[in-house]
Amino acid sequence: MMAMNAKQPFGMHPVLQEPKFSSLHSGSEAMRRVCLPAPQLQGNIFGSFDESLLARAEALAAVDIVSHGKNHPFKPDATYHTMSSVPCTSTSPTVPISHPAALTSHPHHPVHQGLEGDLLEHISPTLSVSGLGAPEHSVMPAQIHPHHLGAMGHLHQAMGMSHPHAVAPHSAMPACLSDVESDPRELEAFAERFKQRRIKLGVTQADVGAALANLKIPGVGSLSQSTICRFESLTLSHNNMIALKPVLQAWLEEAEAAYREKNSKPELFNGSERKRKRTSIAAPEKRSLEAYFAIQPRPSSEKIAAIAEKLDLKKNVVRVWFCNQRQKQKRMKYSAVH
């Protein structure tokens, strides 16, 4: 009985210990499963943390380098250690990512603003030209923490502020051109030259303002006569003078080209633009015509030709005078009756 009782604990002991070892086995298996991806996850977390620290440090260095200028030369060895301690990208799980303590424990890694400013100066032109569009930045993993993206945004802003000379070469040429056009002496000389040529062409200021709409220049319509007058008298504002100068110069070139073409072919323009001049008859000829009219108010064509030859006038002038004189007599008689 005792043997049976003695066997029962030993028989039940494996049964009781089985779940215990099974639970330990499952617990260790669970712990092993949890610990296996831990380096990768931990690496990703610290990778984004390291890159965030580096991005913030570079942004602060960029702001500092703008105010203090260049104080330290560029050191390739320091650049090598700084860049080698931090991986280029956190997308590769196989590359070991160092802990942030490595930045402070290494003898070559004191956070120096002047050195980081020089490093930022050498890096940021390439990034500004490429628009930070490198493949490493274009393919970003979904596990990156949001504060990492914010730090990169601050870095982009700092790079844009610390390198105004990257845009300066492109705006240098328009600045030189605007300086030439905005010279007050040049504007004054052009206004005087424009006025003289306009008068020579026989065009009024109102005609110039109305003709500007025919140039088909975008944003330019007809202008008033007072605007052209103020331009010629230099009473417009400086900015308006600069804006109006190329428009008036374009009109002047077109008007002078049309004037030269008109002078080269006068037979095409004289027929339509010829104006009849008003004929003035001197007092002696006028008294002679009144004497002939008293004798014969309706002379024949031969008589009109003889009178014109005698008074040294054109036949058509004598004929029109007799016609006008008859109309005058009719009006006088009509007014006397009524």
UniProtKB/Swiss-Prot annotation:
Tissue-level expression: Expressed in the chochlea of the inner ear.
Disulfide bonds: none
InterPro entries noted in UniProt: HD, Homeobox_CS, Homeodomain-like_sf, Lambda_DNA-bd_dom_sf, POU, POU_dom, POU_domain_TF
Entry keyword Lyase: no
Main location: nucleus
Keywords per UniProt: Activator, Cytoplasm, Differentiation, DNA-binding, Homeobox, Nucleus, Transcription, Transcription regulation
Sequence motif POU-IV box, location on chain: 56-65
Domain of life: Eukaryota
Family per similarity comment: Belongs to the POU transcription factor family.
Identification of the protein by name: POU domain, class 4, transcription factor 3
Source organism: Rattus norvegicus
